[in-house]
């Protein structure tokens, strides 16, 4: 199971996101 805090963060790439979150195509981490 991925560790991804439920925080709405804008991103351009996966490395902009916290822990195991990835950058979704909507432009937010998830």
UniProtKB/Swiss-Prot annotation:
InterPro entries: Prot_inh_squash, Proteinase_amylase_inhib_sf. The record marks 6-7 as: Reactive bond. Transmembrane segments: none annotated. Inhibits lysyl endopeptidase and trypsin. It comes from Cucumis melo var. conomon (Oriental pickling melon). Keywords: Disulfide bond, Knottin, Protease inhibitor, Secreted, Serine protease inhibitor. The presence of a 'disulfide through disulfide knot' structurally defines this protein as a knottin. This is Trypsin inhibitor 3. Belongs to the protease inhibitor I7 (squash-type serine protease inhibitor) family. Disulfide bonds join 4-21, 11-23, 17-29.
């Amino acid at each position: 199971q991925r560790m991804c805090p439920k925080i709405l963060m804008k991103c351009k790439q996966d490395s902009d996101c916290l822990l195991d979150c990835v950058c979704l195509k909507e432009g937010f981490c998830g």
